[in-house]
């Protein structure tokens, strides 16, 4: 389910194989930094690595840790204590790591965030045979230098190329359109055991060449955004009343999502300009 460039896939496979065998060989785990734009597969890759390697898996979100203030210290110590007592080993994934692991010389770092960073530094100061730390961020330049010194492997998750986007389109079109999987539904305990399955969508006049052309047109979109394009195609098909996706509807969704991407980038540029004006 993780579509990556061949070189990145090969490197991740090597690291996953090493992580799976590290305890057997009696060697320490290698801590990792995953960086790149949002939606490029950092979290999914970490989860897949944990499953493949047989490690237990824990997730911390920097956006959740930072507001805890001084309570973050207690929570972090609890996570590391559990990691060091696990019989299987633990992959500790820290998403949005820059939210509380940013450089200590930054002016707006609170005492609570500094304390949380100090816990991370003290608990990761030496090589570990108990846990592997995987940090994920969109802003690696904001991370504390001492924390970066703990990292053994740095992997850049870039936006997908044309070949990867085409593979994603085919993967997601199968998942959401032509062959949707069944799933258990259990909202608040109701309807447990009932199988829910989306109706398959008929592709009307959409060829392999059309999908390849769309992959080219979707340049600059992340994997998450490509998935959302296909979900929008699903909505268009069901909205037609007959669960059919025509070539015109397919192309209209692609065109609309490209325009939406341009609008979002414009919003970011306006926000950056406003922030720069306020700080000057």
Task: Label the predicted regions.
Residues 1-205:
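Walker A/P-loop NTP-binding motif of AAA+ ATPase domains
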Residues 78, 162-280:
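C-terminal alpha-helical "lid" subdomain
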